[in-house]
Amino acid sequence: MPHTHEDTRAVHAGQAPDPATGAILTPIFQSTTYVQQAVGVHKGHTYSRASNPTVSVLEACLGELEDAPPSVCFSTGMAAETALALALLRSGDHVVVSEVCYGGTVRLLREILSGFGVEASFVDAKSPAVVAAAITPRTRLVFVETPANPTLALTDIAAVAAVCRQAGVLLAVDNTFQTPVLQRPLDLGADISVYSTTKHIEGHNSTVGGALTSRDEALLERLRFVRKSVGSIQSPFESWLTLRGIKTLPLRLRQHSAHAQAVASWLEAHPRVTRVLYPGLPSFPQHELALRQQRGHGGILAFEIEGGLVAGTALMNAVRLCALAESLGAVETLVTHPASMTHGDVPREQRERAGVTDGLVRLSVGLEDPADIIADLGQAIEVAAAAAEEEPCPAAR
């Protein structure tokens, strides 16, 4: 029976009871190698650096969530991005990248791939015209995050996809914040969806992992070859935990979105909060695009309070329920200082131009009762206000 509804897909996509035992959950196939019936005759797997039965089930599940062939899963989200680069780029090639993106992506491009002759241009991907102007005859890939980390800036995927088709360039969309449940880049014209499965997809702070999804079978085969060659496949146990997390993904995202909406609305009304960034707010500059492109707004928001860096640091040190930690998209509410944590490797000029100021706070709203999250933020904001009065914010260096 086809899985036509999102909740049903999340529970059953790519999965069936184990034929050997009847176990309703996919087993963890913790095996290095697989016995072959004869030379060149096997049951689909030969060595777990190349493929693994548990990983393959997760790949089928993720692909089905986006009406695509099985995805390719990796040990981390950054391993997925690295494999994408190795599959597509050569010395002399050029990449156009959204100016606001994860610090690890910036590090990969600026510090690693540049040494192999790959050039990257970081541009304001909110404007399809700016993206189009940045494409050169050497451009092989446009890579955007939407919503972007940590400012939630949006890229019009359909418009940029049209630009890329016109130029003969592939478009990859980092869809980590939204997952296939809230946004489907391939349906909007993208060639590749990029995921850190560590985040919402697994959703319980239990794993690290990554995935690439595409409807281009030749590209998927190339990505599997790269993964086998560099040894970056996801482990069976991590895949099993991720499969378990996906079963509640739509349910969790509905709650994450509702809680984030409540917290964002409260922050926006707070007299000490100077800026709130959340696509679900009518005041968000790209709210109309969010309504058109997304099927929900997710659990991530960002905000600033009076007092800049001093106040922001004091707030993060004062939270009690919320946890000061990197990562996002799990059941616990996490608070992060992007400028010093997730985006610490991004040059200050690029950060500030993109709106990632020293005082910006990123909040991954969890599944705790929003009243408790709000109460914790409220007391932390008061502590931060007192700290800012005692020690005025220093001028930016």
Question: Where are the model-predicted features located?
Answer:
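Glycine-rich phosphate/pyrophosphate-binding loop
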Residues: 20, 28-29, 37-57, 61-64, ...
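Short amphipathic alpha-helical segments
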Residues: 43, 208, 242, 247, ...
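N-terminal glycine-rich, Lys/His-bearing helix-loop that initiates the first secondary-structure elements
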Residues: 1-45, 393-397
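PLP-dependent enzyme catalytic core of the Aspartate aminotransferase-like
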Residues: 110, 119, 137-140, 317, ...
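Acidic-histidine catalytic/liganding microenvironments
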Residues: 65, 267-271, 319
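Conserved PLP-enzyme active-site core in the AAT-like
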Residues: 12, 71-272, 277, 393
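Conserved N-terminal alpha-helix of the aminotransferase class I/II PLP-enzyme fold
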Residues: 33-82, 104-112
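Conserved C-terminal alpha-helix-loop-beta "cap" of PLP-dependent enzymes
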Residues: 275-361, 365
